[in-house]
């Protein structure tokens, strides 16, 4: 409905008719195929990444010369075929290890603490040393500071509401580094160069946890969120989208926005001290190369209006609540999400973002088997 409202505003302002066709949940690809078979084809559609693009690359206009592309803050947020820009992300999200900086700062003041500042956690070895020490001193920390910590990490639940955090988002790290080494964006089969790294961060999650490993199969996403929100854990792998849940007063959580930040997921790779957060998209705009030149230009004009006009930016940033990769979303159109602010700070500090390569994973079965084998 928000896209339809925005399209109506554009039509009222410019006189150009914009029709928005929505698909029922889980039927976007099917709906797109149906619409593409009609005499009047959509001029704008979206794909979720390289796998989605593979089905539609012959329908994607090269956007490299567009004004829309010129407003991108990074080429990390495009889908390319050679030098041709076939898709541009319009929503970006970030994930990493959410942490309670208040508890960590208190820990740093303790005798024999592994670190004296949170900033010292910039690789897997240090993260593990800190988590191990916290796990071994839970009673001491609780007694000294009045917390009710149950573990260093929240439960890494393998219930369907939670397992995507590990078989998709955590699995992205070893895939990213293998792709980075080879200078590729996709492959028919990974070699598993960094699977041992995947295993060691997973082992840390389930060892220094709020629950025993045998309980993980039934632990849910809501339970992990609650554990972090109620200050029962210091570390919690999740993303920027969790901010609204953790700060929603109706949930009754003890943690506040001022308590929270986000650090990278370190897996023990050489040079990871320069790593930032995992930032990417599953929402890319594509302009139909089969449409008329007139319709293509009208579509590009609409998209440029969306990211530059006050009405468009207000809708995207505040009504839809999206974070975008465009340089036009500054000032009042910037997010007040502390996790996004942390991501921006890593970028400002020159840290490299870990791109989302999990969209190249071929199936849910592959994901399930990958966790079984580690």
Mark where each language-model region is.
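Conserved N-terminal structural module of periplasmic/extracytoplasmic solute-binding proteins
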Residues: 1-52, 65-68, 110-111, 269, ...
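Glycine-centered hinge/linker elements that transmit conformational signals in sensory
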Residues: 131-132, 181-218
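Hinge/lid segment of periplasmic solute-binding proteins
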Residues: 48-105, 145-148, 165, 259-266, ...
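Paired acidic/hydrophobic, glycine-rich loop segments that form the ligand-binding mouth/hinge
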Residues: 43-46, 234-238
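Extracytoplasmic/periplasmic substrate-recognition and gating elements
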Residues: 13, 251-320
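Short helix-initiation/N-cap motifs at beta->coil->alpha
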Residues: 22-31, 122-126, 216-230
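Extracytoplasmic/periplasmic solute-binding protein
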Residues: 82-90, 95, 125-186
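C-terminal capping/gating helix-and-loop segments adjacent to ligand/active sites or protein-protein/ligand interfaces
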Residues: 279, 322-328, 340-373
């Amino acid at each position: 409905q928000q896209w339809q409202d925005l399209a109506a505003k554009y039509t009222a302002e410019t006189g150009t008719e914009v029709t928005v066709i929505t698909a029922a949940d889980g039927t976007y690809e099917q709906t797109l195929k149906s619409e593409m078979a009609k005499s009047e084809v959509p001029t704008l559609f979206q794909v979720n990444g390289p796998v989605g693009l593979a089905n539609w690359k012959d329908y994607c206009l090269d956007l490299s010369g567009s004004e829309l592309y010129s407003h991108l803050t990074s080429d990390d947020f495009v889908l390319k075929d050679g030098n041709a820009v076939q898709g541009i992300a319009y929503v970006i999200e970030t994930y990493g290890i959410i942490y309670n900086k208040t508890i960590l700062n208190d820990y740093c003041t303790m005798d024999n603490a592994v670190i004296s500042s949170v900033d010292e956690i910039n690789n897997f070895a240090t993260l593990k040393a800190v988590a191990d020490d916290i796990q071994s001193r839970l009673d001491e920390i609780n007694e000294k500071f009045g917390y009710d910590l149950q573990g260093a990490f929240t439960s890494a639940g393998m219930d369907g509401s939670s397992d995507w955090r590990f078989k998709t988002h955590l699995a992205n790290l070893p895939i990213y580094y293998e792709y980075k080494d080879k200078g590729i964006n996709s492959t028919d089969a990974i070699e598993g160069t960094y699977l041992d790294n995947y295993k060691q961060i997973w082992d840390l999650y389930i060892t220094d946890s709020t629950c025993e490993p045998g309980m993980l199969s039934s632990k849910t996403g809501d339970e992990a969120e609650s554990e972090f929100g109620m200050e029962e854990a210091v570390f919690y792998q999740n993303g920027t989208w969790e901010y609204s849940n953790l700060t929603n007063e109706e949930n009754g959580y003890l943690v506040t926005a001022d308590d929270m930040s986000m650090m990278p997921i370190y897996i023990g790779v050489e040079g990871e001290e320069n790593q930032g957060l995992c930032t990417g998209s599953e929402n890319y705009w594509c302009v139909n190369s089969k449409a008329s030149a007139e319709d293509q230009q009208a579509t590009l004009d609409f998209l440029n209006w969306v990211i530059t006009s006050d009405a468009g930016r207000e809708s995207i940033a505040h009504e839809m609540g999206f974070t975008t990769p465009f340089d036009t979303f500054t000032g009042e159109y910037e997010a007040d999400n502390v996790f996004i602010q942390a991501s921006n700070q890593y970028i400002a500090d020159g840290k490299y973002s870990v791109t989302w390569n999990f969209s190249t994973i071929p199936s849910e079965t592959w994901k399930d088997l990958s966790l079984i084998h580690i």
